[in-house]
Amino acid sequence: MNLKTLVFHHDDRSTDFLKPIYAGLPPATVVTNSRHQNMGELISQHDRVIMLGHGYPGGLFFMVDGSHAALLRQKRDNLYIWCHADAYVKHHGLTGLTTGMFISETAEAKFSGIPANTYSQFTVTHSNDLFARLVAEKIHAPLPELHAHLLDHYQPKGCPIIEYNRKRIQLIEPVAASAKRTQTTATLHP
């Protein structure tokens, strides 16, 4: 797969572990600071968009929000990797590989109800590094293959962080997204 790729990854030390995901791509446009950038124009100029970092159901902090959904809907093989990205993808009827709540820091583990005696900074770092390495290994593959690779190899083996995160990795394919758009349209126009 040789797509013109755009990467949104806000410059943030706490998400540097995600850099290997796009380090091996052919020249990609990497945006780490959205100031003075026309995000919509950048999205329009690329075949796929990889979005990484911290976020919420409304988007990727400092980079992507609801105003970008129509443009993202025209792209293929997008990756949405931030906390609650799945809610953003589903709400806007998008497709791609996405994560739900994704623990990448010890505070997030505590917030997510993981018992404190079952993890450490080491286990969180191990989970982060393994996830990024596995995504990087199949970044050129079709999304169903990347998704299967993650499910096959991002295994808990006693790590509650990986167990939690693994359950929240989803591949949202065009059929499901199309049904969501139809459902939304029906709701808006009874």
Predicted features along the sequence, with ranges:
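A generic local structural motif
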Residues: 35-38, 64-69, 82
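Active-site-proximal C-terminal subdomain of hydrolase catalytic domains
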Residues: 78, 86-190
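A domain-level signal for caspase-like cysteine endopeptidase catalytic cores
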Residues: 1-50, 79-80
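A generic structural signal for alpha->beta connector loops
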Residues: 25-27, 75, 93
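Helix-loop-strand module that forms the ligand-binding subsite of alpha/beta enzymes
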Residues: 68-88
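A short, glycine/acidic-enriched catalytic loop
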Residues: 55-74
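Active-site-proximal beta-strand/loop segments in catalytic clefts of secreted hydrolases
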Residues: 9-11, 52-54, 81-85, 99-101
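A short acidic (Asp/Glu
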Residues: 15-20, 59-63, 89-93, 107-109
